[in-house]
Each structure stands twice: as structure tokens, then as C-alpha cells.
Amino acid sequence: MIQDNFFPLFPHKHLLAIKDLSVQDLNTLLDRAEANVILSNKIDKTKSILRGRTQINLFFEASTRTQSSFELAGKRLGADVISVAIGNSSVKKGETLFDTAATLNAMKPDILVFRHSSAGAAALLAQKVDCCVINAGDGAHEHPTQALLDALTIKRAKGRIEGLTVAICGDILHSRVARSNILSLNALGARVRAVAPSTLLPTEINHMSVEVFNTMKDGLKDADVIMMLRLQHERMTGSFIPSTREYFHYFGLHKENLTYAKNNCIILHPGPINRGVEIASDIADGPQSMIRTQVEMGIAVRMAVMEALLDSRLKINGEKK
């Protein structure tokens, strides 16, 4: 296995957004994650870099995949992991986010994994605490670890990212996953497409370095990678589609639409899946689907992020392990 000392220094205290990272930063995290994938195939999947360290998961939005992935990543690195149940917390009694942050900061954690429905909340929190903050999703803004695990999934399946055509399809307007992936994939040399009805595209889409398509036939033509996104009804305040049935016919991924892409294309989805809305069950469970692989890569990536942040903190501040 590659030793931590062989990786370039990750020059950040927090991981808040893909837009903050250079190409070298992205590749450093992906290389670290590759080493963790190798580790995950061994009987002993653990490391000790976070032994004696505390990781707090603070999720203001419901999560199964992401929170469980961070919990397992921290435990595999030897951390003491605490997940705060917001439903039973002081937040429900009227405590503000910043008061909660001050309380947690007084406990002197080393890593705070944070998810919130408001864009920019993670960056604000990072200003109020002394520990490393990892953004696990802030509103429709960014979800950096999802973009990293998607990049790792693509790289391992295709052997590269540069030069590939990646079609991101669905509710791009409300998707933090889309925004982070557009940034990371462009930086890593992919050709990125946004495929959606005009009602589900952000107004700034023409300034996001993507090709825009309003039909699956045109958007999926010769695609190497298809990334499907769910309709985020919880962020919608009006009617964006006529019906889910019509949406699936025109913008869902089913056998007919899949024929427009390359025969060896791979299919990604960040989850949760709405079968029969944005993707057919036989496609989600088919041989081209990388959905389960994404879950596996998520643990490796989140381990890599925590390793890199702590390694940076130790070297920059001269702290002892």
C-alpha cells in the first residue's frame, strides 16, 4: 500500500466545495482513495490514523447512504464517531445553528461532518469551529464527496476521465450533486453535458461549461457515462413537470433512451433511486449500472478526505498524532 507520506500535502483545513480545489488537490484525493479501495478488499480494512480522534456527524437533512458512509469511513480510520440525532437535539428546542456549533466546538472534536438544507451553511459553520469541517451537502449548492466518489467510479471503470463524454440528466436545477460534478469533471478533462427539460435547468447553466440538451436522444448520443438524478420534490415550490409518467417517457433512462449512448457506457446515480421516474429498474440493476460501486467508492473517498485533512493539519500546525 502507498504510505501517507508519499501523497502531496492537501493545503486545506476544510472540504467545503469542489470549486475550492485545484486539479492536483482532486488527484491527490483520488489517489488516496485508490489506496483505500485496495485496503477494503483485505480482511483487516482498518487503519489507525484517526485513533484517539473524534468525528462528529451533524446532519440537518435526512441521510442513509452519506451518513452511514461517513460513519464507516471514520471507524475504519480508528476514529471515535458520534452521530448527533437532530430530532432529539437542542435544535428542536430552539437552539440556533451557531449555538450548536459553539457547543460542539467546546467538546474539541477533530472532524465535523455537516449537512444542511441551506446553501453556504457549511462555510459559515467552518468559521465558528476550530476543527476540520467536511461539507456533506448544503442545499442545492455543493456535495463535494459525492463528486469525488463519482470521479473515482468513472476512473476505475473506464481507466481515465479525460476525454470522456459525461451526460448528467434530470433535475439539475435543484441538484448539488450536479453542480459539484460539473466542476470536478470539467477540471479533470471530461466533456460534460446537461440533459433536462428547460424547467429543470438553472438560469446560470450557460455559464457552467457544459453542453445543454433538452432531449435524451441528443444528450445521450455517444455518451461514455450517464449520470441520472432524481426529481427533488422536497426543494420544489411549484410544478416543474406535467407528470412523473410523462417525465419518465421523455427524460427517464429506459431501454429505448439507452440505445443513444455508447454500447459500453456506464450508468451512475447518487441515490436514492426513484424507479420508474428517472430510471427503469432493469437499467438500475443491469450490467452497465455502477450504482452499487458508487457506494463502495464512497467509503474509500471519505476515508481519503479525512486522512488528507488530518495529515494537512498535523504538518501545517505541527500537531502530534
Curated annotation (Swiss-Prot):
UniProt pathway: Pyrimidine metabolism; UMP biosynthesis via de novo pathway; (S)-dihydroorotate from bicarbonate: step 2/3
Residues the record lists as binding carbamoyl phosphate: R65, T66, R115, H143, Q146, G271, P272
Catalytic activity: carbamoyl phosphate + L-aspartate = N-carbamoyl-L-aspartate + phosphate + H(+)
Annotated residues for binding of L-aspartate: K93, R176, R230
Record flagged with keyword Signal: no
Biological process annotations from GO: 'de novo' pyrimidine nucleobase biosynthetic process; 'de novo' UMP biosynthetic process; amino acid metabolic process
This enzyme's EC code(s): 2.1.3.2
Gene3D superfamilies on file: Aspartate/ornithine carbamoyltransferase
SUPFAM superfamilies reported in the protein's UniProt record: Aspartate/ornithine carbamoyltransferase
GO cellular component, one term: cytosol
GO molecular function: amino acid binding; aspartate carbamoyltransferase activity
Keywords on record: Pyrimidine biosynthesis, Transferase
Similarity-based family: Belongs to the aspartate/ornithine carbamoyltransferase superfamily. ATCase family.
Described purpose of this protein according to its UniProt entry: Catalyzes the condensation of carbamoyl phosphate and aspartate to form carbamoyl aspartate and inorganic phosphate, the committed step in the de novo pyrimidine nucleotide biosynthesis pathway.
Record's subunit section: Heterododecamer (2C3:3R2) of six catalytic PyrB chains organized as two trimers (C3), and six regulatory PyrI chains organized as three dimers (R2).
HAMAP family the UniProt entry points to: Asp_carb_tr (MF_00001)
Protein name, entry field: Aspartate carbamoyltransferase catalytic subunit
Organism: Bartonella tribocorum (strain CIP 105476 / IBS 506)
Lineage per the UniProt record: Bacteria, Pseudomonadati, Pseudomonadota, Alphaproteobacteria, Hyphomicrobiales
